[in-house]
Design a protein with these regions (language model features):
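Flexible, acidic glycine-rich loops studded with aromatic residues
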Residues: 507, 522-529, 536, 540, ...
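Short acidic-capped amphipathic helix/loop micro-motif used as an active-site/signal-coupling element
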Residues: 465-481
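A broadly conserved detector of short glycine/acidic/proline-rich loop/turn motifs that flank catalytic sites
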Residues: 441, 470, 514
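Secondary-structure edge/capping motif, primarily at the C-terminal ends of alpha-helices
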Residues: 106, 490, 519-526
Length: 583
């Protein structure tokens, strides 16, 4: 037996090999623990990433569903600014900067007064629409643009005030998610809510319900409000928009228009501290901007025609500026007409030899000289064409073929005249080649007493309504699209659209939809012969099978509700027209 001291010493001495094994085991365990912790951390991070991704997917899906819901229920019309329609570079700069600063509340006065509505007004042709496109571009660059609506009298989608609020609600909902959530919830809760039933108070309620503010001030721009609605519908729309802008600090409204009585009266009744008015005729830079624009347009003409420079010479150039009197449309129309003549130099001299009127009178005189040069005087067939063109414009821009059919003139004449009058008319490719006037002042000119081809809108409506009835009597027939099975729903007919295009001409489509719009104008008890003629045409139409064929076409086009509206309008008109007070 070993002494106690030896046993104790052996306990203190560790076998080096055993010590190494123990250390390796400890390191192995530490490494395994570290790897386990790392694996756990990776799994945690992966779970969190997957949860975040799922949240993002859910949010994206919710956003997509809400956007689809808004688009489906609000049915916003297509409208917006176009960069190529803005003011020429170097013009309107001071005014544009002033508007941008107003949006950004850069002045102490703007911060204190919170005048959140800006009304820019001026005469026809002064450049309001180009200015609106430039304003939209500037605001878009700075993330301030919420939406824009460019009114047009010759486009039914852009001439109805009822279309403005839905598109603004839709635009704001797209760029401001908290607002979108509120609108989407209301649409889900009320399946009967439609764009037509939306009240202005509802828009204001939407605005008030937003729990937070957008990062930037947001602006709605409405251009050419005078081309939308009438003197009864516009004030209500203006009240909704100005009330909304006055009640929340982050929303501003910019409106451009002519000084129509109802619009001017509305703003005069507002307190001056709630809005900013701006008369474009008082713009201090207007003359310099007009000269810059005119010089640019003439220089392009000089380059295209290889004319001597400078042209026009200083005296003629100044006379052009004087005649324009601030109207950019005068310059653009003059240059367009010179582009289409055989001798621009001689044509400019002729144009400047006219009377010394300026502004709008000078513009109308220019329109007259263009018509005189291209059409001549007392052209009865052209009268029919321009009458059909202007009368159908509020409903749809029609192509050459349809105008020719409804006016009862040869197609080649319509084509030639539209080409010749390129400074006044154009074919809108976005509307299937529909013919439009280049500027609303051209429409005003044709319906004024200053035009040799003056259009009496009421008489033109009646004559076009009769032409629509004649078109339907001539072209309507049973099973017009030659369908094999009349029991099929429209959605079950694969080639329905191609059949419509092949068998239902554009003139027949237009006539079926709008004959009563033209025919049922307020009665004129001074012209009983016209009333007798109209009633006779209606009798011819309704005594045959044509009403059934008409309803068939409406059904194929998916426009059956138009039939009910038409008949209600017709019944009301017949009652009024045949009452003793009108006979």
């Amino acid at each position: 037996m070993k002494p106690v001291s030896s046993r104790f010493l052996s306990m203190l001495i560790v076998d080096p090999q055993a010590f190494g094994v123990e250390r390796e085991e400890r390191e192995r365990l530490e490494k395994a623990g570290r790897l386990e912790r790392e694996r756990t951390e990776r799994e945690r991070m992966e779970r969190e990433r997957m949860e975040r991704d799922q949240v993002e997917r859910d949010r994206a899906e919710q956003d997509r569903a809400e956007q689809e819901l808004l688009f489906r229920r609000l049915k916003p019309v297509e409208t917006g600014y176009h960069r190529n329609l803005r003011c020429m570079d170097g013009t309107r700069e001071s005014l544009l900067n002033q508007i941008v600063n107003w949006v950004a509340n850069k002045s102490e006065q703007d911060k204190v007064l919170q005048r959140n509505t800006y009304w820019l007004y001026g005469s026809p042709g002064i450049g309001k629409t180009s200015l609106s496109h430039s304003i939209c571009e500037k605001l878009h660059e700075r993330n301030h643009l919420a939406g824009a609506f460019f009114c047009r009298r010759d486009d039914p989608n852009l001439s109805e005030p009822i279309n403005i609020l839905p598109i603004f609600i839709h635009k704001l909902a797209i760029i401001f998610p908290p607002f979108r959530a509120i609108v989407a919830k209301l649409l889900r809760d009320d399946p009967n809510l439609t764009p037509e039933s939306m009240k202005g108070s509802l828009f204001i309620d939407f605005i008030h319900s937003v729990p937070c503010h957008p990062e930037h001030t947001l602006v709605f721009v409405i251009d050419a409000l005078d081309e939308c609605g009438n003197n009864r519908s516009r004030p209500g729309l203006l009240k909704v928009l100005t009330d909304a802008a006055a009640q929340v600090p982050w929303l501003k409204i910019i409106i451009t228009s002519r000084t129509e009585v109802d619009i001017q009266r509305f703003f005069e009744n507002l307190t001056q501290s709630s809005y900013l008015p701006y008369d474009l005729a008082t713009d201090q830079d207007a003359d310099a901007d007009l000269r810059t624009f005119a010089r640019n347009q003439f220089d392009l003409l000089v380059s295209d025609w290889h004319l001597p420079t400078p042209w026009p010479e200083v005296g003629d150039f100044n006379r052009v500026i004087t005649r324009a009197n601030g109207l950019f449309i005068f310059i653009s129309t003059l240059v367009l007409s010179l582009e289409r003549c055989e001798d621009p130099e001689e044509s400019l001299k002729t144009a400047l030899q006219e009377s010394a009127v300026t502004g709008l009178e000078s513009l109308y005189e220019l329109y007259s000289s263009i018509l005189k040069a291209k059409i001549g005087h007392n052209n009865t067939e052209f009268q029919l064409v321009i009458r059909a063109l202007l009368t159908t414009a509020p409903y749809r821009a029609l192509c050459d073929e349809t105008i020719a059919e409804l006016a009862g003139v040869k197609l080649n004449l319509v084509k030639r005249w539209v080409d010749a009058l390129g400074s006044l008319l154009y074919r809108d490719e976005s509307a299937n080649g529909g013919i439009r006037v280049r500027h609303l002042s051209i429409y005003d000119f044709f319906v004024s007493g200053r035009c040799d081809y003056q259009v009496n809108v009421r008489d033109a409506d009646v004559q076009l309504g009769i032409a629509c009835l004649k078109t339907m009597v001539t072209k309507l027939r049973f099973n017009i699209c030659k369908l094999e099975d009349s029991r099929l729903a429209n959605a079950e007919i694969d080639d329905l659209q191609s059949r419509i295009k092949e068998y239902i001409s554009d003139s027949l489509q237009y006539s079926c939809l709008h004959w009563s719009d033209h025919l049922c104008v307020p009665p004129d008890n001074r012209d009983q012969q016209v009333l007798v003629l109209v009633l006779g045409r209606l009798k011819q139409f309704f005594e045959g099978l044509y009403p059934l064929f008409w309803v068939e076409v409406l059904g194929i086009m998916g426009m059956v509700p138009v039939g009910a509206q038409t008949l209600r309008r017709l019944i009301s008109w017949v009652r009024v027209s045949t009452s003793p007070s009108c006979c």
